Every structure is written in C-alpha cells, then in structure tokens.
Design a protein with these regions (language model features):
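Flavin (primarily FAD) cofactor-binding/catalytic cores of flavoenzymes
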Residues: 2-51, 55, 67-221, 256-420
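N-terminal glycine-rich dinucleotide-binding loop that anchors FAD/FMN and/or NAD(P) in oxidoreductases
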Residues: 47-70, 226-238
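Alpha/beta-hydrolase-fold enzymes
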Residues: 231-260
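Mid-to-C-terminal Rossmann-like scaffold of FAD/NAD(P)H-dependent oxidoreductases
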Residues: 418-430
C-alpha cells in the first residue's frame, strides 16, 4: 500500500500540469504553486510574443491522454496552445489546485530528519508562509528566468528615447511600427520577432547573431512535412549511439558512407531552399553536428526577407551603446529605437540552497539527473521538463509518470543510488 504524500509542484507550465496529473491520478494530495497569474509557462499570454507557434506538429506536441483539437492547424499558435493547456487543467481537476501569484523563495530539508522539504512561499498579499511537503517536483524547466544582457551606455540609450526589451516582453507588434528595430540573438524567437517587426511596419530591422545554425523549414523542399524526415527511426539510426553493442557498431560502420551522403544531400537541399548562400548564413558545422535533440524551425519569411534586404543580418555582438547607436564588437554602428534581446533564459533553481545545488549541478553547468528526472543525493525531489527534446510535452508526460512511480517505490526496476550515479556519469561523458 502506497502512502499518500503531500506533493508540491513548482510551476504550472506544460511540465507542471503533467506532474500534477500524474501524482493526482495515483492518490496523492497535490499543491501547484505558480508565481505568475496564469498557467502555461512559456505559453502564458503575457510571456508570448506575437505570431508565436509551435515548432513541433500538433500530433507530437500533446499529452498522451489528450490530443489537440482537430480544428487546430498542424503547428498551433500560442493562444491555441494556451487554450489547450487551460482546458486540460480544467478537465483533469488541476486548475483548482493551482495557487497563482505564489513564489517559492527557498526550500530546505524538513527539520528533525523528517523526510521531505520545507518551502518558504510568498503569496499574493506578499505574506511569507512556511509549508511542509513529503515530495517536491520542480517544473520550472529550461525557460525560467530571462537572460537579460546589459551593455555599457544602456542608460543613456534609454534616456534618449530608446527602448530595450527581452523577447518575453515583446508581446505587442505595435511597438515596432515606424521604429528602427535591432534584435540580438539567433534563436527561433529572434527570427520570429524580426519577421514580425517587418510585417508590423518597422522602418528598419536588423538581426545581430553570433553564428549561423542549421534550420529546418516546416516543409522540406516545399513538399514534405519535416516530421516525415526528422521524426523517424531512420534518422535516429544516422546518429552515433551511446550503446556499445557490437552489432550496432558494425551496422553503423557499414552504413557510414550512405549516412554521410544522406547528410550532404540534406545540407544541399537546405542551402538551396532557404537561400543560405545568398544570405551569407551557411553554418560552419555539418548538419549532423548541429542537429542534436532539437533543431530550430526556419521562421516562414525570414530568409526571403534577409535575401531581399528587408532584414539586415549581421554576424557579431553588441559592444556598447553610444547615444541612440549600437556599437558592435567589430566597430560597426547601428542606429536603433527599439532593441529586443532574444538572449534566452537562465536555467536554474535559485530557491534551492547552494549546498544542494552543488550536488545537482556540475561545475560546467550540467545537471546530474538520472533520466533527467532525479538526483540520487536529493531524496524526495524530482524534476520534470529539464530535458531538451523534439517532443517536449510527450517527454514531460512520460517523465512525470516515471517520477511518481519512482517516488512511490513502484518501478518495475527501482534503481539503486550507485546505479543512478553510474548512468548519470555515463550520459554526461557521452
């Protein structure tokens, strides 16, 4: 008989909802704390930029027990994803368990050697309370704290009328109209915002990026849905595996020339379709080295806009602001009214004391997590959504269901602490 636990889920995004449902379904008492005023995480309307849509098709960006509505397009928009998540939370009784506008300030082990954690929570009235839980699931994921980079001269730039936003704050296209917009970053959000700014009537749009990366169009060759190529066992077999099985090594060695030709063919097709040579945005690395657990989607319209000059793409980075001018590291100067920092997010668990973080994170920033879910040195604690994958929602769903069984000691094979450390070391080395 499994003891019912008091479980705290930190975060009400994609991963938090999956974790809440998994623990709720197995009879545990669940509390979800969410620091913002709405659920959805990156899909929360206040954090979503205009025209955002999924990179994965709707039949893969979904929970295992609830598909997206048939009326949704192949790649749903931000508002559609948020509606899907809201309906999911309502229908499975999760929304009533969420405490919105509640932040976790700190968590520590419970006193007197009692299993579990004590959390310091700050609610809507700014009052701080302490609550004990038997198990905690961290679902703050990879997109938690905006990574805001500050450059010298920032204050003067803003004093003279310039505006600087993080990409998560670019939620109204009207702010780009008539402005000279500079986007810093090379991610999907950066190219999305650059295209949106052009369509919104910006007088000038510049994208500043460090290096070009391989991107995949929604339809390869204009005909084939990219999932028919990238979401297949055939493509998976083209990557080097962590397995040491003799037969697998032999098979990969025999197929190596064919695999090499296949990758070069894909590179040629992408260069041609996306006009990478004309845009001077051909990546230096091979496509198979750039495509790992994820590959950014080519924003529709981005490369044509670079090719015809509507978007100016400059390789480099900011050095400092000089009045209303951005001075690049190579001394090039760009006049700007609006700067959008598409510089990503910081991955972290700031509410976890440093002593515990030292067990969780290697000096090089890698998380020591078995199956990217649990750390053997941090009992009564799990993580959902800390992996990078083509299928974010499906992975969160599977991780949550594995974690609840791990917490209950009901896995078909419950790994020992030493076994978990061994697998973690192997995966980090790989």
């Amino acid at each position: 008989m499994v003891k019912q636990k008091q479980v705290c889920i930190i975060g009400a995004g994609v991963s938090g909802l999956a974790a809440a449902k998994a623990f709720l379904a197995r009879g545990h008492h669940v509390t979800v704390v969410e620091r913002s005023g709405d659920l959805g995480g990156v899909w929360e309307p206040a954090r979503s930029y205009p025209d955002v849509q999924t990179q994965s098709p709707k039949d893969l960006y979904r929970y295992t027990d609830r598909g997206m509505p048939r009326s949704y397009p192949e790649w749903p928009t931000g508002p559609q994803v948020h509606a899907y998540l809201a309906d999911y939370a309502r229908d499975y009784g999760i929304k009533r368990l969420i405490r919105f506008n509640t932040a976790v300030l700190q968590m520590n082990r419970r006193p007197d050697s009692i299993p579990g954690w004590k959390l310091d929570l700050r609610g809507t009235d700014s009052h701080i309370t302490q609550e004990n839980f038997d198990f905690v699931v961290v679902c703050t994921g990879q997109f938690n704290e905006p990574q805001v980079i500050s450059h010298p001269g920032k204050d003067t730039f803003e004093t003279q009328g310039g505006r600087i936003l993080h990409s998560s704050q670019y939620n109204d296209a009207a702010i780009a109209k008539g402005r000279k917009v500079v986007v810093l970053g090379g991610s999907k959000s950066a190219t999305d915002i650059a295209v949106n700014a052009v369509n919104a009537g910006a007088s000038d749009v510049t994208l500043v990026y460090r290096r070009p990366v391989w991107r995949c169009p929604y339809f390869i060759g204009g005909l084939i849905n990219f999932k028919r190529i990238f979401y297949t066992r055939a493509l998976e077999a083209m990557f080097r595996s962590g397995s040491v099985a003799s037969l697998l090594r032999f098979t990969q060695a025999v197929a190596k020339p064919l695999v090499w030709v296949s990758w070069r063919g894909l590179e040629s097709l992408l260069k041609l379709q996306l006009k990478l040579t004309k845009c001077d945005m051909v990546p230096d690395e091979r496509v198979e080295d750039g495509v790992n657990c994820s590959v950014p989607i080519a924003t529709p319209g981005f490369f044509p806009m670079v090719a015809d000059g509507r978007i100016k793409a400059i390789r480099g980075s900011f050095d400092h602001y000089d009045g209303k001018t951005i001075v690049m590291t190579g001394s090039e100067r760009i006049i700007a009214d609006l700067v959008v920092l598409a510089t990503g997010y910081r991955i972290g668990v700031p509410f976890l004391p440093q002593t515990f973080r030292d067990n969780l994170v290697d000096p090089d920033g890698q998380y020591r997590l078995y199956r990217l879910i649990a750390n053997p040195d941090l009992p009564d604690l799990g993580f959902v959504g800390f992996n990078s994958s083509f299928c974010t929602v499906l992975c969160a769903d599977m991780a949550a269901n594995w974690l609840v069984r791990y917490a209950d000691g009901q896995l078909a094979y419950q790994p020992t602490k030493d076994e978990m450390h061994k697998i973690i070391d192997m995966m980090l080395h790989f």
